């Protein structure tokens, strides 16, 4: 178990010489402008905030999917390596697809196990009525099992459109 403490907005991890920031590499607002999503690549969590009142955002969902804090889930026998990085939200806001590789050099530095294990894509079920997030335990794309792998996954696109690009039919 990794001991951690909070220093300001950064996490302090026993085996790291300095506080560890979350490293938010992306931010997303749902199509209905109700929810804001962000990732913390080093901490390992995805967050959902209700921004119906933009001056008073409320944390409504949080899931852990890797990261340096030792909270990596096992999904269908696959332990997640890396941290939440790129993500795509379906147009209805109910499904979020999250990948775990940011940049291979950084991946190797912070998550050396990703070299041999490979990356993954998971699906998070998002409650658009009440807020909340839950990792879908029936969905995983294990890029460690790819031919000529292990491979890493960075960005995906949602067929028919998604909330994070200007692609929709």
Predicted regions and their residues:
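Short coil/turn segments that connect the beta-strands within blades of beta-propeller domains
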Residues: 32-34, 92-94
């Amino acid at each position: 178990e990794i001991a951690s403490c909070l220093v300001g907005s950064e996490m302090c991890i026993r085996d790291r010489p300095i506080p560890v920031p979350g490293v938010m590499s992306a931010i997303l607002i749902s199509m209905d402008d109700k929810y804001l999503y962000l990732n913390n690549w080093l901490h390992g969590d995805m967050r959902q905030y209700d921004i119906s009142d933009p001056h008073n955002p409320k944390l409504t969902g949080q899931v852990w999917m890797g990261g340096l804090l030792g909270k990596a889930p096992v999904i269908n026998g696959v332990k997640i390596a890396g941290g939440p990085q790129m993500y795509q939200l379906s147009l209805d806001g109910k499904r979020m697809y999250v990948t775990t590789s940011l940049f291979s050099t950084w991946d190797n530095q912070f998550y050396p196990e990703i070299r041999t294990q490979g990356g993954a894509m998971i699906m998070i079920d998002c409650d658009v009525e009440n807020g909340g997030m839950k990792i879908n335990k029936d969905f995983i794309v294990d890029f460690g099992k790819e031919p000529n792998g292990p491979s890493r996954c960075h960005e995906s696109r949602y067929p028919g459109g998604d909330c994070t690009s200007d692609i929709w039919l």
